Amino acid sequence: MNRNNPLEVLGHVSWLWASSPLHRNWPVSLFAINVLPAIRANQYALLTRDNYPVAYCSWANLSLENEIKYLNDVTSLVAEDWTSGDRKWFIVWIAPFGDNGALYKYMRKKFPDELFRAIRVDPKTHVGKVSEFHGGKIDKQLANKIFKQYHHELITEVKNKSDFNFSLTG
């Protein structure tokens, strides 16, 4: 696969999207807003086996302001938002052929000292929650300290936003 050919990458991601029980019924507009900016910004990982795509993830580097916007409406990110800060969020994670573990290991190795968060939705209840992930070499206590700081900054900012709809309680 040629990572320098965005159409080839797009084709591989389309194949994975269509093969995923979670993603295949989503509208094309979600594909466009969740995949195209990642390819343009080179903020994605695409795993292949025998030249066939097996797993894909994308991430956005959000500012606090855009993080709040994303949590309030996961369809709200525009291309500029993807590179607006240093708060990493997994936007898409697809591994329809059983390669979730391989993608997880790849990302922990690619970003050994980084922290990521993701919104994960329970397919049965449709309830979302924020999950946290960290690279393979970062000290867990340090990671927890930084995540707590993220939470504090987030809660401080959303307290004054009357239009914020995301629940901060479990």
From Swiss-Prot:
Keywords: Acyltransferase, Cytolysis, Cytoplasm, Heme, Hemolysis, Iron, Metal-binding, Transferase, Virulence. Proteolytically cleaved by the protease systems ClpAP, ClpXP and FtsH, leading to its degradation. It is an enzyme of class 2 (transferase). InterPro entries: RTX_toxin-activating_protC_bac. The acyltransferase activity is inhibited by heme. GO terms for cellular component: cytoplasm. Its main location: cytoplasm. GO terms for biological process: killing of cells of another organism; toxin metabolic process. It holds the Pfam family HlyC. One of its GO terms (molecular function) is metal ion binding. The active site is at H23. Heme binds at H151. Its EC number is 2.3.1.-. It is found in: Cytoplasm. It catalyses: tetradecanoyl-[ACP] + L-lysyl-[protein] = N(6)-tetradecanoyl-L-lysyl-[protein] + holo-[ACP] + H(+). Monomer. Protein-lysine myristoyltransferase that catalyzes myristoylation of the protoxin (HlyA) at two internal lysine residues, thereby converting it to the active toxin. Belongs to the RTX toxin acyltransferase family. This is Protein-lysine myristoyltransferase HlyC.
